[in-house]
């Protein structure tokens, strides 16, 4: 694992060096992100590297879960000609937005079936549209659904066992998702239940079916 990370670093370094040699680095956009949070399995010593940071005290909240520790990741973008060095944004985005952003970069109209939202305005320091909500699901850990809507984060776990309860967290006050406030926000839960049904479609591949939702 350490060798893969080191090799990636070396290759990206070689690429950026070559871009500088041919005077194209200033005109090149490079994006980095991750598909999930840190893992706690096998070769990764997440405790030693503190790679899970604030989520390190709970292995249920890292890779494989839809808690913040499993899905909240940083994104780094460099584009010297356009992006101010050292700039920072709290814009909430998703990997689905990368395709929409690239289309926007090339001024290509986004197809109607693409749900991603371009974050190019954020990169350029302009006014940015925001998602009404972001939705996730996975059949790991007995099936999970999650939703981010403004300050609210909702998660339903153990769907395959018949669980229908939705946990709700106010991320402005509770980033670690320790305090379930669903019982005191039933109106929000009702709205989320509707979105959980509207946002999903049956997966094309049966390998991604969730017991209790698809069979």
Give short role names for the model-derived ranges.
Residues 7-46:
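Metal-dependent active-site segment of extracytoplasmic phospho-/sulfohydrolases and closely related
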Residues 174:
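Intrinsically disordered, low-complexity polar regions and short flexible loop motifs
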Residues 1-7:
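The substrate-binding groove and active-site-proximal loops of carbohydrate-active enzymes
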Residues 198-210:
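Bilobed periplasmic-binding protein-like "clamshell/Venus-flytrap" ligand-binding domains
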Residues 38-66, 83-87, 91-171, 205:
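C-terminal cap/loop subdomain of S1 sulfatases and analogous C-terminal strand-loop tails that border
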């Amino acid at each position: 694992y350490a060798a893969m990370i080191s090799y990636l670093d070396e290759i990206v370094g070689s690429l950026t060096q070559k871009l500088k040699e041919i005077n194209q680095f200033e005109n090149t956009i490079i994006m980095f992100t991750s598909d999930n949070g840190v893992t706690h399995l096998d070769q990764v010593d997440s405790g030693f590297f503190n790679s899970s940071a604030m989520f390190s005290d709970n292995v249920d909240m890292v890779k494989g879960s839809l808690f913040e520790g499993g899905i909240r990741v940083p994104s780094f973008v460099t584009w010297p000609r356009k992006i101010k060095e050292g700039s920072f944004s709290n814009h909430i985005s998703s990997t689905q937005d990368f395709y929409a952003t690239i289309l926007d970069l090339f001024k290509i109209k986004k197809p109607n079936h693409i749900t991603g939202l371009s974050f190019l305005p954020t990169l350029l320091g302009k006014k940015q549209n925001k998602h009404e909500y972001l939705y996730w699901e996975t059949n790991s850990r007995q099936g999970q659904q999650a939703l981010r809507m403004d300050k609210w984060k909702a998660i339903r776990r153990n769907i395959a066992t018949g669980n229908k309860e939705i946990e709700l967290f106010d991320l402005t006050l509770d980033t670690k998702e320790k305090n379930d406030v669903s019982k005191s926000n039933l109106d929000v839960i009702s709205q989320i239940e509707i979105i959980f049904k509207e946002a999903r479609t049956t997966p094309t591949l049966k390998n991604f079916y969730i017991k209790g939702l698809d069979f």
